[in-house]
Amino acid sequence: MTEQPSYLKLLDQGLLETRVEELERLLESCTVCPRDCLNNRLNNDIAACYSGRLPIVSSYTAHFGEEPPLVGTKGAGNVFFGNCNLRCVYCQNYQISQTHKQQIKNEVTHERLAEMMLELQALGCHNINFVSPTHFAPQMARSILLAARKGLRVPVVYNTNAYDAVAVLQLLDRIVDIYLPDLKYADDESGYLYSKVSGYKEFSRLALREMYRQTGDELVFDENGLLRRGLVVRLLVLPNDVGSVAESIEWIRDELSPRVAISLMAQYYPTHQAETNKRYVLLSRRIRETEWLKATAALEELGMSEGWVQEFDGASYYYRPDFEDSETPFKDIRDFS
């Protein structure tokens, strides 16, 4: 029998609402992410993420471009939040992450977000996959509470850039079933230059330690091979070894566990500022096959055998969203191998 999502246990114990209220208090003087802006988002005072009291949902859809045990046969139920706490110059979702004046039009109530989750479940989606949830973690939790009361029964995926506050992650323990962090850099300099944040290395690694504390290195699957609980660390290979993928792999092995699942991704392509601004020339091309082979070799040499590896051929062409079409922003998606 498939184990129920952990947030339902919290609901039954009467603890889920308490957690939600604790998370929402962080919005009053915002410490929801490591930027610690201290603005009162409950009064819609905005700061770095340009986000106030209510969640912003730019798109929600069944999605088939995630890792195989998240996609299954019916897709992951992706909820794409608008805005972001990072400013990545190569963001593939920049149409929704860095257009705050347009995204305010996509603000929804918590009740409406809960309805979206239930709609995705009704479509047969195997999970609710929150994309870029960090700056909306309290709103996400409130909506999960509302949806759970109305019959939500699928796992919750926290698909994050890893620039997360440990205190927030601790409150999300057992609200989130699956952590899917994108570990971007092994140095602070790259984090500042390419994502406009300070201390990325330290904060992301602290966040991953907390995620690992909650889930361990075991992936829990159901009888159909669908992922129900666990931690999967994504590593996007960037050109010119920006990000130092091998160093991140080694840190995961040594500081977390050699059995942590890694999802190695080849889908990088220059977009947004990386495509046009000469300051970011190191990111101005797709990765070369030699760079990809170096990254896959690092996985093998460091003994990291759990996880998934994208196909190199064509990956940078297939994973190109267009959020002008909010209902189907992804086309022609290939799976991981």
Task: Kindly give the residue locations of the regions a language model identified.
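Conserved radical SAM core fold
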Residues: 97-98, 137, 162-165, 183-201, ...
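Short glycine-enriched, charge-decorated loop/helix-capping segments at active-site entrances
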Residues: 95-105, 193-198, 277-286
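Anionic-ligand binding region
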Residues: 192-224
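Aromatic/hydrophobic pocket-lining residues that form the small-molecule binding cavity
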Residues: 110-113, 140, 204, 208, ...
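Auxiliary Fe-S-binding modules of radical SAM enzymes
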Residues: 1-45, 216-337
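Conserved Radical SAM active-site core
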Residues: 49-179, 187-189
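Hydrophobic faces of well-ordered beta-strands that scaffold small-molecule active sites
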Residues: 77, 128, 156-158, 179-181, ...
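Alpha-helix-loop-beta-strand connector modules within alpha/beta enzyme cores
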Residues: 144-155, 207-211, 289-295
